[in-house]
Amino acid sequence: MRAEEQSKIREAAAGTIFLLIGTVCFASKSIWIKWAYQMGAEPDAVLLYRQLLAVPLFWLIFLIYRPPMPDGKKKGDLWKACGAGVFCFFLSPLLDFIGLNHVSAMVERILLMSYPLFVFGFTACRDRKMSSIQDLFAVLAVMFGLFLALGGWNAELFQANMIGAVFILLSSAVYAGYLVLSGHLVHQIGGIRLNAYGMTAAGAAMMLYTGIKSAAGMNTPMAAYPLSMYGLFAVIAVVTTVIPFVLMLEGIKRIGAQRAAAISMAGPILTIFYGALFLGERLGLIQVIGCGGVFFVITGMEYRKLKTGKKE
């Protein structure tokens, strides 16, 4: 085997390993957050410390990589990146973290998978295009799967999950709106620059949000936590946020975005496994059927999009 071929094999193997580790780390996010909640942290505090710890690390990544500015960039693009960051890194996670306080990590991960459903709806409205029968069937199948995942006809279980589900579905909708309206910014200014500016804006928005809540008398404990809690905050910021970004970035460089997306689809399955192993969470049979249905339909939609090279 020639040296060039061996080099390509090593690159592909390294890229796959990077992506697998990144997916494993990112999939554990809900588990660490759940542990923080069990130790007494509030959703606002978890998100605030995640932002404060992640922002300088994203700027460090920016300085290390020093990505060149893409051609044709406009001055307003950086401001758009900040605006996009408020939605993608502040509002969407805030709704998700609040919702996760009311549902299991398993259910939360499946609900977050619904974002392609919102992307589909927003794109159809934007482009004013009629959907195909196949797409409409997929939408109805996902909606029915989500209904089952929340408890289906078990009224008590369904009601217990409803509050959290509303927040998490809103989080998915906000993220989908970001993808439809601002997804092109990744190509215009680059993913590293978008994350640095966006996360900075999100951190500022989070501090403003907590300040407004404090002024309104809705104080959330932000300090006086035990040392172990700050360790959890650091893990959430570094292990489940920054490290996955770097590993996926390096993995995509080596094996391409399509193969990377295929590997990352294992994330929801890993979260469900973590929830059962580390949190002792369990799903009823109806919920398992619903989660499985949502996973396979959404995965099928994403695979078809990857195969056809379709972009929103």
Swiss-Prot record:
Chain segments annotated as transmembrane: 13-33, 45-65, 81-101, 105-125, 133-153, 162-182, 198-218, 229-249, 260-280, 283-303
Keywords of the record: Cell membrane, Membrane, Transmembrane, Transmembrane helix, Transport
Subcellular location(s) per record: Cell membrane
InterPro entries: Diverse_Substrate_Transporter, EamA_dom
Primary site of residence: membrane
EamA domain boundaries: 173-303
UniProt KW Transmembrane helix keyword: yes
One cellular component (GO) term of this entry: membrane
Membrane-related topology note: Multi-pass membrane protein
Pfam families: EamA
Family: Belongs to the EamA transporter family.
Protein name: Uncharacterized transporter YcbK
Gene (UniProt): ycbK
